Structure formats: C-alpha cells, structure tokens
C-alpha cells in the first residue's frame, strides 16, 4: 500500500503552475496522479505524445481548447480526457488559479517540465 501526504510529494514547476506528483513511474503502478495548479491568466500550448491524460477540476475556472479551436469550459466538477494525445490549449481564467487532479498513463518519471517558450505545442 502506498500512502502519501501533500507535504511528502515531488512538486514541479511545470511552466505555468505547479504539479504535485503523488504517484510516479518508480511506484510501479503504471500511471501517475497529480494535484496540478494552473496559474490564473495563463495560456499553455500542450500535447502529450507519450501519455494519455485525464483531468478533473476541483477549483477555479478556465477552458481547454482543441487545436482546431473548439473550446470546452472547465469548472469544478468537469473532467476532460485527452484520449487521442490531443494538442490543446489549457487556459486559466484571470480571477483565480485552476486546480486539477490529473492522471497520466503511462506514468511520469517525475521530473518532466514543459517548454512553453516554443511556438510548437510543448510535450513530454
């Protein structure tokens, strides 16, 4: 059994917020679970070519926008899943941080960070 508290986990500044990584590849479960904060007013160009990701919003509001421009509002109680390694924009509204519980499969190593300075979608 694995039991972890927030103050015991790896915290990574992923580019536009913090990712608290509760489960990692080294845990041997095959997936990662994170508590991720997206800073208010930020827009991130993201794509996971080696991972599938599902995110459940627990705080804040924003939107996830497909590469084709289709926008989906995010608010507490909303889940979105990137089941096709979708390139997307993750946007946190101006008034507050967006907080998501995320699951990645396969698992992350734990040290991954995005390059948000690129004109391409950042990936890992």
Feature annotation, model-predicted:
Residues 1-31, 113-124:
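A short, N-terminal "cap"/entry segment at the start of jelly-roll beta-barrel domains
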Residues 28-31, 39-42, 59-63, 86, ...:
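Short, charged/polar surface micro-motifs in flexible loops or helix N-caps
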Residues 17, 33-49:
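Conserved short histidine dyad/triad with adjacent acidic residue
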Residues 68-85:
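Short acidic-glycine-tyrosine-enriched beta hairpin
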Residues 45-46, 64-65, 82, 88-95:
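Short beta-strand His + acidic residue motifs that chelate non-heme Fe in jelly-roll/DSBH
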Residues 37-38, 49-64, 103:
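Short, conserved beta-strand element in jelly-roll/cupin
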Residues 36, 54, 81, 96-112:
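A short hydrophobic beta-strand segment most commonly corresponding to one strand
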